[in-house]
């Protein structure tokens, strides 16, 4: 089996009114552990719709995932927030629960300077004894860190790596070369194979809730030197991702999970609730890519 790490980005189940469905979250965790055999879960990130949750809701999600996982897999709590006080509170909460790793998205919207970004990470970590992955996703944050800036952030020994959700493969090569001992996890599911070629340590992704066995097979093929097989598997995954995006990816992920026997509930508004057309599209995706 591949030594590369496979993390699913944990989804958050909601009811129609946007209230958290704790049973749905537990079912998702169990599926990822028992069926998908993932190495870990990335909790309260973009896939978890965490930027639409209040502090107490984020704590509920973190607590429920931690309790259901019960030490079976690695867990990463995404605590980043524009509200630094909240980020610090969540970092302490997750650490006290027992999360072995934290992560934090770069602060966004206000065009913060790099010195302000560095201070943000150092403040989050100042009062907790834990490790952190920088969540770099410039397409959504507008924050594109450079190799030199990553080096400055890594001066804090608690910052151990990057969730690298960025299509800049030149930068990825430079960062991997400069920091061979840091944990770098690829965050774009559709770009996993080229990221593997640049020696990332593994991956974190939303579609791995559905597609983890195929992704594990791809990583195993890559590690075994069977690049043709790995490329064929990436082609299939990318066909699936194209279909998911065309059908509205976040609600469709949950609709396909329902076909797999897991009621992941609804997305949180202003995301769209399913239409009959969307449900039909999700059924077609399930039958094309997952039905045995």
From Swiss-Prot:
It is found in: Cytoplasm. Its EC number is 4.1.3.3. It is an enzyme of class 4 (lyase). Optimum temperature is 60 degrees Celsius for synthetic activity and up to 70 degrees Celsius for the cleavage reaction. Is very thermostable, maintaining 80% of cleavage activity after 48 hours at 60 degrees Celsius. However, at higher temperatures (70 degrees Celsius), activity decreases to less than 10% in 8 hours. Temperature stability is further improved by the presence of stabilizing additives. GO terms for molecular function: N-acetylneuraminate lyase activity. Pathway: Amino-sugar metabolism; N-acetylneuraminate degradation; D-fructose 6-phosphate from N-acetylneuraminate: step 1/5. Optimum pH is 7-7.3 in both synthetic and cleavage directions. Is active over a broad pH range, from pH 5.0 to 9.0, in both directions. Maintains 5 to 10% activity in the synthetic direction above pH 11.0. The enzyme is also stable at basic pHs, where it maintains around 80% residual synthetic activity after 15 days of incubation. GO terms for biological process: carbohydrate metabolic process; N-acetylneuraminate catabolic process. It catalyses: aceneuramate = aldehydo-N-acetyl-D-mannosamine + pyruvate. Pfam families: DHDPS (PF00701). GO terms for cellular component: cytosol. Homotetramer. Catalyzes the reversible aldol cleavage of N-acetylneuraminic acid (sialic acid; Neu5Ac) to form pyruvate and N-acetylmannosamine (ManNAc) via a Schiff base intermediate. This is N-acetylneuraminate lyase. It comes from Lactiplantibacillus plantarum (strain ATCC BAA-793 / NCIMB 8826 / WCFS1) (Lactobacillus plantarum).
